[in-house]
């Protein structure tokens, strides 16, 4: 998966998980998505994407909440507290 494609995909996962995390009927569907976000957040790919964003290498109009230092962490913390 190319960098922009990956960032867009992960951003969509993050948005969906944030919207649906409080709906307990969706938790079984969210679990693999949360795991995928966690894997990305702890991978060298996330760090490279973040570094490239900070270096101005990504399009300025790209939605990039996934690259914030807290977005995934806050979601994972909330997810853990709900289980």
Question: Locations of the language-model features?
Answer:
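Short, structured coil/loop segments at alpha-helix boundaries
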Residues: 1-2, 23, 27
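Short, charge-rich amphipathic alpha-helices with coiled-coil/heptad character
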Residues: 1-14
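Long, low-complexity or tandemly repetitive, helically biased scaffold regions used
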Residues: 9-12, 19-25, 32-83
